[in-house]
Amino acid sequence: MDMRVPAQLLGLLLLWLPGVRFDIQMTQSPSFLSASVGDRVSIICWASEGISSNLAWYLQKPGKSPKLFLYDAKDLHPGVSSRFSGRGSGTDFTLTIISLKPEDFAAYYCKQDFSYP
């Protein structure tokens, strides 16, 4: 049985999905942040177009994979400290960490979950 026809048909259907965009760009600031234990820090994330609250935050420690810790812009993953908080909707989002602890020092990334390539 030749499976190429259904795959081609699926490709055509995907081209006709109305209102679906796959080119949302994300920008974070600052790109580097110097902080000390006990500090309060904020990281801002912007989307090139509205993504509602479809934003997740990940942290990555050296030699480890990124780890989801906040989703839907403000909801903490189970077990994540309430020292972390997120807010925002549309195009502007903020991650805030209060009372920094040594284990908080990592790379932080925002990721939109509104559309996929």
From Swiss-Prot:
Residues 1-22 form the signal peptide. It is found in: Secreted; Cell membrane. Residues 111-117 are annotated as: Complementarity-determining-3. PROSITE patterns: IG_LIKE. Residues 72-78 are annotated as: Complementarity-determining-2. Residues 57-71 are annotated as: Framework-2. Residues 79-110 are annotated as: Framework-3. SMART domains: IGv (SM00406). SUPFAM superfamilies: Immunoglobulin. It holds the Pfam family V-set. This is Probable non-functional immunoglobulin kappa variable 1D-42. It comes from Homo sapiens (Human). The gene is IGKV1D-42.
